[in-house]
Structures are given as structure tokens and as C-alpha cells.
């Protein structure tokens, strides 16, 4: 296990975690000090991973994020693929979160590993939206047309069972004043521009 190796060698360890460690039943953002209460197998496995890291090495950075996108299979790319292959897309309007680019998450990690500010952090872009609003913005920036319909998660083409309110408060990042995460629409626009240029 990497946490055991980190302890033996004195290395710093970064563990990427998720909003799924919370139950998502309330309507205010979760801070690093809120009790975890995962409702899915995935969430329970991520919490177990967090606990394992905490147990075996104190030189750890646990970063919880959500709705992360970049290269590979993620919500942004699935929406864009659907726009190219379908006439209609049903998207959940009852799941709320903060879309976060992998690039912004990487910036936080690169900063933290140069410090000894060990602990658990929430790291998401600023602002809140639902999946339907997220899809609307993706399609607008891509200049693509598709009949987009807001539905409940159970009817959605893209969303699986996730916490309904997956909003994280970057409380500790604000306290240590390291890096202001951008607004989610700003970050998404940057990502989409890079896709076009690439």
C-alpha cells in the first residue's frame, strides 16, 4: 500500500477523494469538519481509503473534489458525444455540485506538496449548478445543438445515483489563503477553448 511506503520512506502522499463520502441530503455546502456519511459503495470505499491514509502516514494531503472533468470519460465528454450522436438528451436537474477541471485540481496539488500543510482539503471550483445547467453551459460553449431535457436522476441518460447535493466548501483553502479556485463557468470556458485549440 502506498501509504505504508510513504510512512517508511518519509514521502508525502496525495489521496484524491470525493464528495461521495457525504450523504448529500442537506442543502448547504459540506466543510472538511463535517462528519462523513457515505450512502454508496463507491463513497464507502473512498472514505475507507481516506481513513487508511490517515492511519498510516501523517504526511498526507487528502483532496476531496467533485464533478471533475478533463481528458477521458467524464460528464463533459459524454455530453459532447451525445450532442454528436443523439437528437435528445435527458439530464438530471436534481443533482447539485461544483464542476471542477482536472487542471485546477492539479494546481492545488502542486502547491500543497511544496508545503507541510498536511490534512484534508476540499478543492472545487466556485459556484453551484445542477447537472442540467452544467450540460447547457457545455453545449453553449461548444456551439452544439441538441434537445436537452431536465429530468430526475432516475430518468437521466448520463447520471448514476450520486449525492443529491454534492457541494463542497473550500473552507481550509480559504483559511491558509493559497489559491482561489476560479468560478466554474470561467474554468469550463478555459477548458473548452483549450479543446478547440488542441
Predicted regions and their residues:
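Active-site Tyr-X1-5-Lys
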Residues: 7-8, 24, 37-61
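SDR active-site strand-loop-helix element
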Residues: 13-19, 63-65
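Mid/C-terminal beta-alpha module of Rossmann-like enzyme folds, strongest
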Residues: 108, 115-160, 164, 171, ...
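C-terminal amphipathic/interface module of NAD(P)-dependent oxidoreductases
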Residues: 146, 164-198
Amino acid at each position: 500500500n502506498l501509504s505504508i511506503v510513504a510512512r517508511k520512506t518519509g514521502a508525502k502522499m496525495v489521496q484524491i477523494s470525493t464528495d461521495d463520502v457525504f450523504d448529500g441530503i442537506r442543502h448547504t455546502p459540506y466543510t472538511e469538519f463535517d462528519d462523513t456519511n457515505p450512502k454508496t459503495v463507491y463513497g464507502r470505499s473512498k472514505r475507507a481509503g481516506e481513513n487508511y491514509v490517515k492511519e498510516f502516514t501523517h504526511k498526507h494531503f487528502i483532496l476531496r473534489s467533485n464533478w471533475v472533468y478533463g481528458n477521458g470519460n467524464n460528464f463533459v465528454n459524454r455530453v459532447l458525444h451525445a450532442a454528436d450522436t443523439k437528437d435528445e438528451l435527458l439530464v438530471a436537474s436534481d443533482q447539485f455540485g461544483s464542476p471542477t477541471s482536472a487542471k485546477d485540481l492539479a494546481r492545488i496539488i502542486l502547491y500543497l506538496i511544496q508545503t507541510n500543510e498536511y490534512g484534508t482539503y476540499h478543492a472545487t471550483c466556485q459556484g453551484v449548478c445542477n447537472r442540467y445547467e452544467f450540460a447547457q453551459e457545455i453545449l453553449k460553449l461548444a456551439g452544439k445543438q441538441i434537445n436537452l431535457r431536465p429530468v430526475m436522476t432516475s430518468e437521466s441518460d448520463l447520471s448514476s445515483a450520486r449525492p443529491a447535493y454534492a457541494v463542497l466548501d473550500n473552507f481550509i483553502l480559504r483559511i491558509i489563503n493559497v489559491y482561489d479556485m476560479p468560478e466554474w463557468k470561467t474554468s469550463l470556458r478555459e477548458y473548452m477553448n483549450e479543446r478547440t485549440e488542441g
